[in-house]
């Protein structure tokens, strides 16, 4: 399935049905009074969060959604049938924005929550409403209300507790596959991960969700590479696990590149708690590991953890640390 995280769609509520002009007809009743019924209400447009959906792909090819119109009123004071509301399911984490993209209309952060974005039009009045002492046979009725219409943007921000960040080929997908049951594509070349991958980590009856974001490169916040498109998916997370390729000749430059992109993208990412890990320590000597750790700690003033997703060195420690941070922030 394609991963689609942003779409623009047109939505419109159902128009109200028209009121009816009708007069009572009955044998031996010469002049029956007005009995025109009211028009039915138009259907509303309602968005609903659904945990079974994880992409907006259903809105990529169909972009126009219109609720059902209300039925017209009928004689014998019969009201028109109300139009059926249109319910549009979206993934948890979906945000609804105005057409210009500047106004947030709703943010779905929980499952099975509904948001009525457009109310259906009211039905028109039948002629029975317009009978007066001087007008016993009114030929007047009102038309149904025209419902609101609009273009909106749907933007999906995945809900995860932990975000995996790092340059391409830092070992993020392997880390995800080791600590969860997720099966991301893994290979020894950059940009193996083309879309975000989610996995659930289970530890002693506790769990959290971790997201593997496609690798960042210099200029990602300006649209270079793949990272810019997906950085939004880790804005909601509690903690970042920053993986650095231990076999790199310049771990400082690698770290700084990713940090600059995070800080340039938003203050949300800039201020996230960060767990720094030097990965692929299985290909380094103990002396090389310590040398690189000291370099990074001197620059970052943070603890740096040596790990290997190949041998599982230090991986469980990182997972437990992430869980502890998450629990402290709840």
From Swiss-Prot:
<dbReference type="InterPro" id="IPR036726">
    <property type="entry name" value="GTP1_OBG_dom_sf"/>
</dbReference>
<feature type="binding site">
    <location>
        <position position="193"/>
    </location>
    <ligand>
        <name>Mg(2+)</name>
    </ligand>
</feature>
<dbReference type="InterPro" id="IPR031167">
    <property type="entry name" value="G_OBG"/>
</dbReference>
<dbReference type="GO" id="GO:0042254">
    <property type="term" value="P:ribosome biogenesis"/>
</dbReference>
<feature type="domain" description="Obg">
    <location>
        <begin position="1"/>
        <end position="159"/>
    </location>
</feature>
<feature type="binding site">
    <location>
        <begin position="308"/>
        <end position="310"/>
    </location>
    <ligand>
        <name>GTP</name>
    </ligand>
</feature>
<dbReference type="InterPro" id="IPR006073">
    <property type="entry name" value="GTP-bd"/>
</dbReference>
<dbReference type="InterPro" id="IPR014100">
    <property type="entry name" value="GTP-bd_Obg/CgtA"/>
</dbReference>
<feature type="binding site">
    <location>
        <position position="173"/>
    </location>
    <ligand>
        <name>Mg(2+)</name>
    </ligand>
</feature>
<dbReference type="GO" id="GO:0005737">
    <property type="term" value="C:cytoplasm"/>
</dbReference>
<dbReference type="InterPro" id="IPR045086">
    <property type="entry name" value="OBG_GTPase"/>
</dbReference>
<dbReference type="InterPro" id="IPR006169">
    <property type="entry name" value="GTP1_OBG_dom"/>
</dbReference>
<dbReference type="Pfam" id="PF01018">
    <property type="entry name" value="GTP1_OBG"/>
</dbReference>
<keyword id="KW-0378">Hydrolase</keyword>
<dbReference type="Pfam" id="PF01926">
    <property type="entry name" value="MMR_HSR1"/>
</dbReference>
<feature type="binding site">
    <location>
        <begin position="191"/>
        <end position="195"/>
    </location>
    <ligand>
        <name>GTP</name>
    </ligand>
</feature>
<comment type="similarity">
    <text>Belongs to the TRAFAC class OBG-HflX-like GTPase superfamily. OBG GTPase family.</text>
</comment>
<comment type="function">
    <text>An essential GTPase which binds GTP, GDP and possibly (p)ppGpp with moderate affinity, with high nucleotide exchange rates and a fairly low GTP hydrolysis rate. Plays a role in control of the cell cycle, stress response, ribosome biogenesis and in those bacteria that undergo differentiation, in morphogenesis control.</text>
</comment>
<dbReference type="GO" id="GO:0005525">
    <property type="term" value="F:GTP binding"/>
</dbReference>
<feature type="binding site">
    <location>
        <begin position="212"/>
        <end position="215"/>
    </location>
    <ligand>
        <name>GTP</name>
    </ligand>
</feature>
<keyword id="KW-0460">Magnesium</keyword>
<dbReference type="InterPro" id="IPR027417">
    <property type="entry name" value="P-loop_NTPase"/>
</dbReference>
<protein>
    <recommendedName>
        <fullName>GTPase Obg</fullName>
        <ecNumber>3.6.5.-</ecNumber>
    </recommendedName>
</protein>
<feature type="binding site">
    <location>
        <begin position="279"/>
        <end position="282"/>
    </location>
    <ligand>
        <name>GTP</name>
    </ligand>
</feature>
<dbReference type="GO" id="GO:0003924">
    <property type="term" value="F:GTPase activity"/>
</dbReference>
<dbReference type="GO" id="GO:0000287">
    <property type="term" value="F:magnesium ion binding"/>
</dbReference>
<feature type="binding site">
    <location>
        <begin position="166"/>
        <end position="173"/>
    </location>
    <ligand>
        <name>GTP</name>
    </ligand>
</feature>
<feature type="domain" description="OBG-type G">
    <location>
        <begin position="160"/>
        <end position="327"/>
    </location>
</feature>
<keyword id="KW-0342">GTP-binding</keyword>
<keyword id="KW-0963">Cytoplasm</keyword>
<keyword id="KW-0547">Nucleotide-binding</keyword>
<comment type="subunit">
    <text>Monomer.</text>
</comment>
<keyword id="KW-0479">Metal-binding</keyword>
């Amino acid at each position: 399935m394609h991963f689609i995280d942003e779409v623009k769609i047109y939505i419109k509520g159902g128009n109200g049905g028209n009121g009816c002009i009708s007069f009572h007809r009955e044998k031996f009743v010469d002049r029956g009074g007005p009995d025109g019924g009211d028009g039915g209400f138009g259907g509303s447009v309602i968005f609903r969060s659904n945990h079974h959906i994880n992409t907006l792909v259903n809105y990529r090819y169909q972009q126009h959604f219109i609720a059902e119109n209300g039925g017209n009123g009928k004689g014998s004071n019969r009201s028109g049938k109300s139009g059926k509301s249109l319910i549009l399911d979206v993934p948890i984490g979906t945000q609804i924005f105005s057409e210009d993209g500047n106004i947030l209309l709703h943010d779905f952060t929980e499952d099975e929550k509904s948001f009525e974005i457009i109310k259906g039009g009211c039905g028109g009045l039948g002629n029975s409403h317009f009978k007066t002492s001087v007008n016993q046979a009114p030929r007047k009725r009102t038309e149904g209300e025209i419902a609101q219409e609009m273009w909106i943007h749907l933007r999906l921000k995945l809900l995860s507790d932990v975000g995996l960040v790092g340059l391409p080929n830092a070992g993020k997908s392997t880390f995800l596959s080791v600590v969860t049951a997720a099966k991301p594509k893994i290979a020894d070349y950059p940009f193996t991960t083309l879309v975000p991958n989610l996995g659930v980590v289970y530890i002693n009856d506790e769990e959290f969700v971790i997201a593997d974001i496609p690798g960042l490169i210099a200029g990602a916040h300006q649209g270079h590479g793949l990272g810019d498109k997906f950085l939004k998916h880790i804005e909601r997370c509690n903690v970042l696990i920053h993986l650095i390729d231990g076999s790199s000749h310049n771990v400082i430059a690698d770290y700084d590149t990713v940090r600059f992109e995070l800080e340039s993208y938003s203050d949300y990412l800039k201020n996230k708690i960060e767990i720094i890990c030097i990965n692929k320590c299985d290909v380094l000597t103990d002396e090389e590991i310590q040398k690189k750790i000291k370099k990074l700690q001197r620059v970052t003033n943070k603890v740096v953890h040596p790990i290997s997703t190949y041998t599982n060195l230090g991986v469980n420690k990182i997972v437990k640390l992430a869980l502890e941070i998450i629990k402290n922030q709840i």
